[in-house]
UniProtKB/Swiss-Prot annotation:
Its EC number is 2.1.1.33. InterPro entries: SAM-dependent_MTases_sf, tRNA_(Gua-N-7)_MeTrfase_Trmb, tRNA_methyltr_TrmB_bact. This is tRNA (guanine-N(7)-)-methyltransferase. It comes from Clostridioides difficile (strain 630) (Peptoclostridium difficile). GO terms for cellular component: tRNA methyltransferase complex. Substrate binds at residues 123, 155, 192-195. It comes from the Bacteria. One of its GO terms (molecular function) is tRNA (guanine(46)-N7)-methyltransferase activity. The lineage of its organism: Bacteria, Bacillati, Bacillota, Clostridia, Peptostreptococcales. The gene is trmB. Catalyzes the formation of N(7)-methylguanine at position 46 (m7G46) in tRNA. The keyword Transferase applies. Pathway: tRNA modification; N(7)-methylguanine-tRNA biosynthesis. Belongs to the class I-like SAM-binding methyltransferase superfamily. TrmB family. It catalyses: guanosine(46) in tRNA + S-adenosyl-L-methionine = N(7)-methylguanosine(46) in tRNA + S-adenosyl-L-homocysteine.
């Protein structure tokens, strides 16, 4: 089924010139500190959705720079509107595809990657599209600094099992694994819109962190 586009979303999104980047993103490769005008650590969320998670983090941590990447313009617009309403100065939004990150980021340019409730691509023939597939993990390994981390959350148990296996097989250090985040002792959880909905329905949320090995 073809996704229905919201009329005027493209134009409105691009009107937020303070926040939104779509064209010539590759020219910022290795120069994101200049774009942010500081040398603070850079954290990126792939598939930011409506933006509750990343904008909350940006409010809580003004000494960290955040980049939110999203391909769907309608939901990205909602995320940008949240940032604009709060007048955030430590966040940028990339209107682009995760598969192009090596064009966007220099080696060791990022400190942390967030992946929240990504498409599970359930059929085996689609496994390479999963954002925790080894092909993506290799790219993350390149753009993350030494000791950089991936923080991953999903409601899909099969995707979580797949992800743990892929992460371990690619020589990352797994830590802080939770099989039921809502009933765990983890105190610093910032939720997404999806997560709030799932938790209200009593669904389990799976979470882990993966640390890059030197």
């Amino acid at each position: 089924m073809r996704r229905r586009r919201k009329k005027g979303a493209d134009e409105k999104l691009l009107s937020y010139t303070k926040y939104v980047l779509r064209d010539d993103i590759d020219k910022l490769k290795g120069k994101w500190n200049l774009k942010f005008r500081n040398d603070n650590p850079i954290h990126v969320e792939f598939g930011t959705g409506k933006g509750k998670f990343i904008t909350t983090l940006a409010k809580q941590n003004p000494d960290i720079n955040y980049i939110a990447m999203e391909l769907k313009e309608e939901v990205l617009l909602k995320a940008v509107e949240k940032a604009d309403a709060s007048n955030l100065n430590n966040i940028l939004f990339l209107w682009g595809d995760v598969s192009n990150i090596l064009d966007y980021f220099e080696a060791k340019e990022l400190s942390r990657i967030y992946i929240n409730f990504c498409d599970p691509w359930p059929k085996n023939r689609w496994s390479k599209r999963r954002l925790t597939h080894s092909g993506f993990l290799e790219m993350y390994n390149r753009v993350l600094e030494d000791d950089g981390e991936i923080h991953f959350k999903t409601d899909n148990e099969k995707l979580f099992e797949f992800s743990l296996n892929e992460i371990a097989a690619n020589n990352w250090l797994l830590k802080n694994i939770s099989l039921d985040l809502g009933n765990s002792e983890y105190e610093n959880n910032v939720t997404t819109e999806y997560e709030d909905k799932f938790m209200s329905q009593g669904m389990r949320i799976f979470r882990c962190e993966a640390k890059k090995r030197n």
